[in-house]
Amino acid sequence: MLPAMKTVEAEEEYAEDCPELVPIETKHQEKEENLDFIIKIPVTIVTGYLGAGKTTLLNYILTEQHNRKIAVILNEFGEGSAVEKSLAVSQGGELYEEWLELRNGCLCCSVKDNGLKAIENLMQKKGKFDYILLETTGLADPGAVASMFWVDAELGSDIYLDGIITVVDSKYGLKHLTEEKPDGLVNEATRQVALADMILINKTDLVSEEELNKLRTTIRSINGLGKVLETQRSRTHLSNILDLHAYDTLSGISLQKKLQHVSTAPHLDQSIVTVTFDVPGSAEEESLNVFIQNLLWEKNVKNKDGRCMEVIRLKGLVSIKDKPQQMIVQGIHELYELEESRVNWKDDAERACQLVFIGKNLDKDILQQLFITAVAETKEQTTAPGQDGACPPH
């Protein structure tokens, strides 16, 4: 129970304190060992700007009775150069805890490999968990952290990335999202929203409806693909948070329905926008790979102002020549994959390529024309409009 608080701010400060991990009751804690090692464990990344309510969300999840064994990775800041990170799990009424010392506040940098190995070792030593929640620092890039798990899944790991949740503070979110960095780079809060599969607009009771509408519009213009929920004190139904399956090979039908609701964002003042287009017909697989690699790897595609386009997130449903299945493409930063769905195209007349890009300096017209020019079945890959030399590294 919360102690008596004199102000809303005091209550929020208490809620943001590091949560005390509580035992999670499980009905079936004794499972067969072999089955335990077959099931892959989902990892949900919880990110958001400092003070948005990430820790409050974790505390809420940990105190709910959902019959799961949950491992929690908490990000704690220290005054010195080293940061301690706690790996803990509530299991059978006992709290197991190990410490992994970090030299900076970002899991994806100097401890990229060790961080993942620590999770796997913890799982082997203490037994399997039903779920892992990873809280990133307020200044971390969740895309790099997500890539770590995505790559490891390809290597046969027994954990997989389930989704990214970004918590946004209603009161200060607009300020954070529109803040301009002197070096011209994308600010951390905007990047976190751009990469989210689920966006929680938190503390909605502290702002007016007008302020909330401005924040909604800004968030949707940055990320037209993620789901948006509004919360107070980071509380929402657990089904909205756990088991998102955002990176699974979705059926073509479900992805097609989702893409139909995504539209190109109006050009406001945001540095990151969502762009989408639909091109009828099929694509050559090799040409499609070159098109994506030029965007994600070579970064040599420019907009009308001569600025390099930076794709942070990519998702789409495409038709590949000579393949009966609908193909799903998705990517984060420099990683992408093209996989078969479980749905076949009914006939050639319905074949099409639907793509959604989230990123910086994006130009829909140039992207669409480049796609048509470079990926058409009868075309060879050539230098297309907007592709006239490598961009400088970011």
Swiss-Prot record:
Residues 272-375 form the CobW C-terminal domain. Zn(2+) binds at residues 106, 108-109. CDD domains: CobW-like (cd03112). GO terms for biological process: intracellular zinc ion homeostasis; kidney development; protein maturation. Keywords: Chaperone, GTP-binding, Hydrolase, Metal-binding, Nucleotide-binding, Nucleus, Zinc. It is found in: Nucleus. It catalyses: GTP + H2O = GDP + phosphate + H(+). The keyword Hydrolase applies. Gene3D superfamilies: CobW-like, C-terminal domain, P-loop containing nucleotide triphosphate hydrolases. GTP binds at residues 48-55, 109-113, 202-205. One of its GO terms (molecular function) is metal ion binding. Zinc chaperone that directly transfers zinc cofactor to target metalloproteins, thereby activating them. Catalyzes zinc insertion into the active site of methionine aminopeptidase METAP1, which function to cleave the initiator methionine from polypeptides during or after protein translation. Mechanistically, the N-terminal psi-PxLVp motif binds to the C6H2-type zinc finger of inactive form of METAP1. This is Zinc-regulated GTPase metalloprotein activator 1.
